[in-house]
Regions:
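Bacterial N-terminal signal peptides that target proteins for export
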Residues: 1-9
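Cleavable N-terminal signal peptides
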Residues: 8-11, 21
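Sec/Tat signal peptide C-region and signal peptidase I cleavage site
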Residues: 17-23
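Surface-exposed, polar helix/loop patches in the mature regions of secreted/periplasmic/lumenal proteins
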Residues: 87-125
Length: 125
């Protein structure tokens, strides 16, 4: 009986710890996305914009490993699909930056914020 109880307690704490680590990892990725989105919009030169976009892409790519719970009954894209869309928009903005079109890239970057807002609307975080 003691072994069963001990095993149950250990399993519970392992599950709780893994959930906490996952939430912290996702939270860190979301903070990195937000911080670098702001840096991208404030960038005065292509190098700063490219660095911010690269950091955003890394955070979005890393975030794909987390499967988020939908908080609506509406049919919505998976969290992985939303992160894929964000990555596509980041790549489009990066192409514009590399072509010397920083202002146009910032306009393109607004779609990233729209996707972020959509994700926050549909997913628990």
């Amino acid at each position: 009986m003691i072994k069963k109880t001990l095993a149950t307690v250990i399993m519970f704490f392992s599950l709780a710890l893994s959930s906490t680590v996952m939430a912290a990892g996702l939270h860190d990725d979301m903070e990195a996305l937000g911080k670098n989105y702001k840096a991208f919009n404030q960038a005065k030169n292509p190098q700063a914009a490219t660095t911010a976009l690269n950091n955003m892409r890394n955070a979005a790519t890393h975030s794909k490993q987390y499967k988020l719970a939908v908080n609506t009954t509406d049919k919505v894209p998976t969290s992985t699909a939303l992160f894929d869309q964000i990555i596509v928009e980041i790549d489009k903005a990066k192409v514009l930056v590399q072509a010397g079109k920083l202002d146009e890239a910032k306009k393109q970057g607004k779609k990233i914020a729209e996707l972020r807002d959509q994700g926050h609307k549909y997913y628990t975080h």
